[in-house]
């Protein structure tokens, strides 16, 4: 799994001008699933995301987790995280899981995450418009293959 984690003050996702998910202070996750991902990758990602201390405490230090601030998550499926740009000018996405597996794992990931924090989502496979106000900005790349 590859996940882009962005700390935000607010964010929303729309499909055809209809808002389907929105959060206030929290995290936007762009989630990519690889063919070799397992439920262990999901567990690792959920553990890291929910305990990562990337929110500021009263002294301005990044010392609080998403759980500590009672923040929310907006999770967006993003197969393009596996773009291969080595050849030519058109990216190839052969490094991404097939849509059936990716959808299944994306759902499981969001269900597991929802056991710890409030989760809003986009719609798997849809053409979405994501709006957000970055906080910091703080952007972190989590790759479950680099544990």
UniProtKB/Swiss-Prot annotation:
UniProt subcellular location: Cytoplasm
Swiss-Prot/TrEMBL catalytic activity: glycyl-tRNA(Ala) + H2O = tRNA(Ala) + glycine + H(+); a D-aminoacyl-tRNA + H2O = a tRNA + a D-alpha-amino acid + H(+)
The Gene Ontology biological process annotation of the record reads:
D-amino acid catabolic process
Gene Ontology cellular-component annotations: cytoplasm
Keyword check for Hydrolase: yes
Q: Locate the motif Gly-cisPro motif, important for rejection of L-amino acids.
A: 136-137
Q: Which InterPro entries match?
A: Daa-tRNA_deacyls_DTD, DTD-like_sf
Report keywords, A-Z.
Cytoplasm, Hydrolase, RNA-binding, tRNA-binding
Broad enzyme group: hydrolase
Q: List GO molecular-function terms, semicolon-separated.
A: D-tyrosyl-tRNA(Tyr) deacylase activity; Gly-tRNA(Ala) deacylase activity; Ser(Gly)-tRNA(Ala) hydrolase activity; tRNA binding
E.C. number: 3.1.1.96
Matching Pfam families: Tyr_Deacylase
Q: What does this protein do?
A: An aminoacyl-tRNA editing enzyme that deacylates mischarged D-aminoacyl-tRNAs. Also deacylates mischarged glycyl-tRNA(Ala), protecting cells against glycine mischarging by AlaRS. Acts via tRNA-based rather than protein-based catalysis; rejects L-amino acids rather than detecting D-amino acids in the active site. By recycling D-aminoacyl-tRNA to D-amino acids and free tRNA molecules, this enzyme counteracts the toxicity associated with the formation of D-aminoacyl-tRNA entities in vivo and helps enforce protein L-homochirality.
| Family to which this protein belongs | Belongs to the DTD family.
What do we know about how this protein assembles, alone or with others? Homodimer.
Q: Which NCBIfam families match?
A: D-aminoacyl-tRNA deacylase (TIGR00256)
Protein name (Swiss-Prot/TrEMBL)? D-aminoacyl-tRNA deacylase
Tell me which species this is from: Streptococcus agalactiae serotype Ia (strain ATCC 27591 / A909 / CDC SS700)
Q: Top-down, what is the taxonomic lineage of the species of origin?
A: Bacteria, Bacillati, Bacillota, Bacilli, Lactobacillales
